[in-house]
Structure formats: C-alpha cells, structure tokens
C-alpha cells in the first residue's frame, strides 16, 4: 500500500532524532496514550514529529500556544508535506472585544469584533480536510477547544452533486441559500454563486483559488468542473463533488424553529425567577433583549450574539460539552502539543476566565442562563476527547511528567551544537559587566539577548545602553505580534545588536545569531526565574557556535542550581556524542525568513524586485492594524474582480499575485507569486 503521508526533505534524521522517531512510533503502536518528546532548543523537534507522522501514517492535529508559533509550525509542515492536506486553525478575529458588564460602574460593553476572511477560509479548509482526507495535518491554537458548529448539522447540510443526476434548477439555488451562499451575478467571490442560464458558478467558502461550475441540460447535471474564477479557465472536470456550508454555524430551519420554542420556555422560567427576587430592571432588560433576538432568528436565521443560544442550536443538554474541532477529528487521529508546558495550562485556564465573565451577564439580565453553555471545553472534557497524545517541550510541566508513559529525550543536535556554557556572576555590578560583554559580542558581529524582571527595567536598561552607544531595542507585552516579529527580524539582520525583554524571550525565538544570553537578577525566585523559565531562556543561545549564558545573582537559588545542573547534564551528553562520532559542531546559517514571508533572494532572476524594495513593501503592510489590512485586501480583491469582469485578465492576475504576496507576508501561508523561496540550510530544514 502506498504511503499517503509523503515527507519531502533533502536531509535525513541525525543526532538523537532517529532514536526519538523509533521510540515514539513504537509507543504509539503499543497503545501508549501519552508520550513526551523532551527536545532541547535546536534539536529539530518539528522534523522528528514530521518523520513520526510519516512512519505511523495517521492524521494529526498539532496544538501551539499562540498564533505566532502556530504560523511557524504551519509553514514548516507545509514544506515537509507539500503533497498532503496541511491546515491552519486559529481564531479568525483580528480584533475581539467580548460582551461584558461592569456592575461597579453600571457599564455594559457590547461585543465588537473584526473577522479575518483569509483565516476563516483556512479554518473551513482545515475541517474539510479532516472530514474528507486521510492525509490531513492541522496546526491549531487553543481556539480548537472553543465552540464550533455542530458536526452532524454541518454534514447534514452539505450538497452532493453527481454528473447524470436529475435535479431541480431552483432546488439547487434553494439549497445554496440554505448553506448561506449569496447570489451575486456581477462578481464571484468566496461564499457567493452566480447563475447564467443553465450554468451555475459557485465559489466555495473554503477554497482559495478554485470555483465550481455546474452545467445543466434540462433537469440533468451534464458537467461538473473546477475553474479559475479570474480567467474562467477550466482547471479539471470531475464526476462528483461536495459543497460545504459557508460557515460552521449553519443550522437547518427546523432546528431554528425548535430552538426558538426552547428559548421562549427558558425565558419564561428565568423571568419568573427575576420577578420573584424583585429584580425588575434585570427582568425587563432580559425580556426585551431576548424577544428581539427571537424575532431576528425567525426573520433572518441569525441574530447578533446567536452563539449565546448555541446549546439549543446544537441540541445539547444543560452543561453538556460544546462541539469543537476535536469532534471533527478522524478516529485514528494523533494529537501533538507543542511547547506543552505552556499549552496544557492554557487549555485549563480558558474555561474559568470565560465562565466568570458570563456569570455577570446572566446575573444582571443581559443573557439567559443557557449562555453559560457557550464556552470552551473544560479540561476534563478535553482529556476525554483527546486522542493519543505526544507532548513536545524542552521543559515538560507537571501534567506531562505525571501522565506520560514514556519520556523520549532528544538532547543531541544534528548540527553538533552543544548547550551554552553557563556562568554565575555577582548582581551588584551586573549592568557594567553586561556592557563589557556586549562590547565583545558586537565586535564579533554577534547578538545579545538580555532578560529583566519588569517593563520599567527593560525600558531603563535600554535607555542606559543607548547612552553608551549600544544599538539596542526592548521587547515586552505592550508590543503587538507583528511589530514583535519585525523587531526579531531586525535583530537577525544586524540593524541592532542587543534585545532587552522579559517573558517574551523564552519559547519560540529562533535566532542563530545570538551568542550571549544575560539573565539579570537571576536569584529573584518567581515565575520569571523558575527552573523551567531559566532553562528555556538559556536555550536561546544554543543555536550559536559560541553560545554562552550569564546568570547575574548574589546567590544560587534552587531554581538556578537545577537549571544549571540540567544544562550541564545535557552539555556533557552532547560533547560525549560529538567525541564518539567525531562530529565537529557547525553554526547555523539560517535565511532570515519567519512569519512575515516574502523577502526575495538577491539575484533570483530577471524581473524580480530588489530585496530592499520588497522588505519596505512587506514592512508597509505588516505595520498596518488588522482592520486596515483587511480593508486594503478587500479593496484589492474588488479591483481584481472588476478587471476580470472587463476581460482585463493581465491586470486581474497582477492583483491576484499581489494579494497572494501580502497574505504570504502577514500569514506565512502563501508563497510569493513572483519569487522563489530562499533555500534553507540543513539546520533550518531539520530544526
């Protein structure tokens, strides 16, 4: 039988990778429910997981702690599995202000959100991959445990078409309306359809570049094909196809009517409780808001905040778990949790924060009690749904340690690089000593990361270093994701030499140019100076041939001692492996390419833009706020469709390529249409 998962890479597993792949595969075959891959920074954990997926040939969901790391993993998995269905499932909100009420000031804050159309399309494509293909890999954030449309209702609404079937022309249009597709005979874009005689063109909501053409002859389907919505070129013909709803939250009409009846019953019960407690204002508010929602549902099929009635729409019992992405997983799926020491606690925290906010809304008459069931999964519910699981972390947390049947170490790097040497120095002269170390590193054209305890300290230290003519920037939580990526990229390019930060300098920073990590006030016990945090931070220097970590403190705390001991244990094992196998460590020469894609290789061919110009263009778009960026993309898409209508296909194609490039810069999902990607080194391919 031919393998359905086909890993594409020029490199073979090395270091500890072959043993890790073998042990993980054997553990899955033996039925181990939980395993942990304890892989140090730069050891190629993603490449190990990719090889394991190819070995076991099972669909996989990969959970990441945030959108940034999810985008990096998505990009890497697409490179490893170009012939398979690799999906991306994160929150589709560019901006989200949840509904809330502050009793102290009697302030009601309505829900406000901006939906990213591109990510919504990728979410739909991800669930479709799980439903249709056995070779699906989906990278998701903790958004995967939030309520999604009921899987059974979603599947019951799909429209199946087959060549030769007898159909009613009006019946197809009626079914498309039920799937929430809109008719638009002037321009065709995602989620719309147009009718020209006996030809029906449909642009599926989950499709990025292909539309569907249904050709009828009287009441019979004569032809089904996929075509380019810009040029009209037929791409390929098929004998059958399936059209999925425009949204995960589509609901049959009969279910809506049944839900309305149940909402009315709960409203009557809740009003009786409020009047009995003499809460007249709350009762009046609740009745007015709920009856308005009911009218909207009956007339339009939806209302603002319809998710608060999701328990009725998905026909669940009070307290029953909501449908989520995990309900869409195939029975033989695998779960990989990246940076599990961060992701697992997040999974437990989502429910508690959501519950506290909604209880206030219910208490003061803004929502019915059933709104409490519009929630993420509880941790126990997630545990019941989770398939065989592999935790991936350099510093596994207590949950992983307690539950894992096997802990597989991946300490030896394919490049032969070893963990940095760790040194403890007095805190009294830490700033002056740091300045001296920075001078040495910058003279060698190397970069420095410095971690402090507070935002104020980060800003003050940055100002002090600037006064001493050090090229320095700081990084903390007030800086948004896109600007954060730009700062890291500028550090790698050498636009500055020192980056000062707090907690943001731990997981997910891949900067081979950093040769020194300095941890100020390392002897201050706490979350930021715990054993796990220190090991993660020290690991930021592990990708450099001259990597070194300095911990400034007047005493060696328990956390410091354990972190230093663990780093030294790994370092000894790596050095012994290198000596036994006569490996000479080599530095990583990694192309400067991260979540903001689209920087072209110099001299990559005639007609390509210069690197500087492209960098400026990429920076221009990535600096835009999400709402402005979405608006700009919509403007370009409208212009593209207008050119296509006027048969100006060259201009339309140019705009299509421009849109693709922009999405590549921002979402790291699309390749640049006019420039090849840079070739990565061996270390980049396997790390």
UniProtKB/Swiss-Prot annotation:
Q: Where is the motif named Beta-hairpin mapped on this chain?
A: 92-115
List, alphabetically, the InterPro entries matched. Helicase/UvrB_N (IPR006935), Helicase_ATP-bd (IPR014001), Helicase_C-like (IPR001650), P-loop_NTPase (IPR027417), UVR_dom (IPR001943), UVR_dom_sf (IPR036876), UvrB (IPR004807), UvrB_inter (IPR041471)
Where do the Helicase ATP-binding domain residues begin and end? 26-414
Where in or outside the cell is it found?
Cytoplasm
UniProt keyword Isomerase present: no
Q: Which residues form the UVR domain?
A: 630-665
The record places domain Helicase C-terminal at 430-596
Enumerate the Gene Ontology biological process terms: nucleotide-excision repair; SOS response
Q: Could you give the domain comment from the record?
A: The beta-hairpin motif is involved in DNA binding.
State how it assembles: Forms a heterotetramer with UvrA during the search for lesions. Interacts with UvrC in an incision complex.
Q: Identify this protein by name.
A: UvrABC system protein B
The organism encoding this protein is Nitrosococcus oceani (strain ATCC 19707 / BCRC 17464 / JCM 30415 / NCIMB 11848 / C-107)
């Amino acid at each position: 039988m031919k393998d359905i998962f086909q890993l594409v890479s020029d490199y073979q597993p090395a270091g500890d990778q072959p043993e890790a792949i073998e042990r993980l595969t054997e553990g899955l075959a033996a039925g181990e429910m939980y395993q942990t891959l304890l892989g140090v920074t730069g050891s190629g954990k993603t490449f190990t997981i990719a090889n394991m997926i190819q070995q076991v040939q099972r669909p996989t969901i990969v959970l990441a702690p945030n959108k940034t790391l999810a985008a990096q993993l998505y990009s890497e998995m697409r490179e490893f599995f170009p012939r398979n269905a690799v999906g991306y499932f994160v929150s589709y909100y560019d901006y989200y202000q949840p509904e809330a009420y502050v009793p102290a000031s009697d302030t009601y804050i309505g829900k406000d959100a901006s939906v990213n159309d591109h990510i919504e399309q990728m979410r739909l494509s991800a669930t479709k991959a799980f439903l249709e293909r056995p070779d699906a890999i989906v990278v998701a954030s903790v958004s995967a445990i939030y309520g999604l449309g009921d899987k059974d209702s979603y599947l019951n609404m799909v429209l199946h078409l087959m060549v030769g079937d007898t159909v009613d022309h009006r019946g197809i249009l009626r079914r498309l309306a039920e799937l929430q597709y809109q008719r638009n005979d002037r321009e065709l874009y995602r989620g719309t359809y147009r009718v020209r005689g006996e030809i029906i063109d449909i642009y599926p909501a989950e499709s990025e570049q292909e539309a569907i053409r249904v050709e009828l002859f009287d009441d019979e389907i004569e032809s089904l094909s996929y075509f380019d919505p810009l040029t009209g070129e037929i791409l390929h013909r098929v004998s059958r196809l399936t059209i999925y709803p425009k949204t995960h939250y589509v609901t049959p009409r009969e279910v809506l009517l049944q839900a309305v009846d149940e909402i009315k019953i709960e409203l009557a019960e809740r009003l009786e409780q409020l009047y009995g407690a003499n809460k007249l204002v709350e009762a009046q508010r609740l009745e007015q808001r709920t009856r308005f929602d009911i009218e909207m549902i009956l007339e339009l099929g939806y209302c603002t905040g319809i998710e608060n009635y999701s328990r009725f729409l998905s026909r669940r019992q009070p307290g029953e778990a909501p449908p989520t992405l995990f309900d869409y997983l195939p029975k033989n799926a695998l779960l990989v949790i990246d940076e599990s020491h961060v992701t697992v606690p997040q999974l437990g925290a989502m429910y508690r924060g959501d519950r506290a906010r909604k209880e206030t809304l219910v208490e003061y008459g803004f929502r019915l009690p059933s709104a409490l069931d519009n929630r993420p999964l509880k941790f126990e519910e997630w545990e019941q749904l989770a398939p065989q699981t592999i935790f991936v972390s350099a510093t596994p947390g207590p949950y992983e340690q307690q539950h894992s049947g096997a802990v597989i170490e991946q300490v030896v790097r394919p490049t032969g690089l070893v963990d940095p040497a760790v040194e403890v120095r007095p805190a009294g002269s830490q700033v002056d000593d740091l300045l001296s170390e920075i001078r040495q590193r910058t003279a060698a054209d190397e970069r420095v990361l410095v971690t402090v305890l507070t935002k104020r300290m980060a800003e003050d230290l940055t100002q002090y270093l600037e006064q001493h003519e050090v090229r320095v920037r700081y990084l903390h939580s007030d800086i948004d994701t896109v600007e954060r990526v730009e700062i890291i990229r500028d550090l790698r390019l050498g636009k500055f030499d020192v980056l000062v930060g707090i907690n943001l300098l731990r997981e997910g920073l891949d900067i081979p140019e950093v040769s020194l990590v300095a941890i100020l006030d390392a002897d201050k016990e706490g979350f930021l100076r715990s054993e796990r945090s220190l090991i993660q931070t020290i690991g930021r220097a592990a990708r450099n041939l001259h990597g070194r970590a300095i911990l400034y403190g007047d005493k060696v705390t328990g956390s410091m001692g354990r972190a230093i001991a663990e780093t030294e244990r790994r370092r000894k094992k790596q050095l012994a492996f290198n000596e036994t196998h006569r490996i000479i460590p080599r530095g990583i020469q990694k192309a400067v390419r991260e979540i903001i894609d689209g920087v072209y290789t110099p001299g990559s061919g005639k007609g390509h833009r210069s690197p500087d110009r492209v960098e400026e263009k990429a920076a221009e778009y990535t600096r835009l706020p999400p709402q402005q960026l979405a608006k700009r993309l919509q403007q370009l898409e409208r212009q593209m469709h207008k050119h296509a209508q006027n048969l100006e296909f060259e201009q339309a194609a140019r705009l299509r390529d421009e849109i693709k490039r922009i999405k590549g810069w921002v979402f790291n999902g699309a390749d640049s249409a006019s420039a090849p990607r840079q070739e990565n080194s061996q270390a980049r391919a396997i790390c």
